């Protein structure tokens, strides 16, 4: 009976998740830590602009990785494409000494809402797809 009650208390839903992180982040940090962090923060501002534009919600981040929930798959894909275009343009600028490239994975699946965070297979699949990108 206790297990059944615990299951009912879990807040589940279907969500569209975008996972992204920096390619070769550890190597960038090893080579030039301060410049890498500076560039990562600038790229994060670009990402936040597109998250807002496409009605997304950043629910988890750590180091160079970001997890975002979207109301639709179309919004997630449009956000990813716009972000990659802006990052590519930024990386081709003469001012950038440490260009950062981002991998992105998008999935739709069941998640568990825990406070403001999302957990579960839907998040894990997005992270696995991102790692394959």
Language model feature labels by segment:
Residues 2-79, 86:
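Catalytic NTP-binding/metal-coordinating core of nucleotidyl cyclase/transferase enzymes
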Residues 8, 45, 67-133:
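Catalytic beta-strand-to-alpha-helix segment of the class III nucleotidyl cyclase homology domain
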């Amino acid at each position: 009976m206790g297990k059944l009650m615990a299951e009912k208390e879990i807040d589940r839903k279907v969500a569209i998740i975008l996972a992204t992180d920096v390619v070769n982040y550890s190597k960038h940090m090893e080579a030039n830590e301060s410049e890498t962090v500076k560039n990562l923060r600038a790229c994060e501002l670009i990402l936040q602009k597109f998250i807002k534009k496409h009605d997304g919600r950043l629910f988890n981040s750590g180091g160079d990785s970001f997890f975002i929930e979207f109301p639709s798959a179309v919004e997630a894909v449009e956000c990813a494409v716009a972000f990659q275009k802006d990052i590519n343009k930024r990386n081709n600028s003469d001012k950038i000494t440490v260009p950062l490239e981002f991998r992105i994975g998008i999935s739709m699946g069941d998640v568990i809402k825990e406070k403001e965070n999302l957990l579960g297979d839907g998040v894990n699949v997005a992270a696995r797809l991102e790692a394959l990108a």
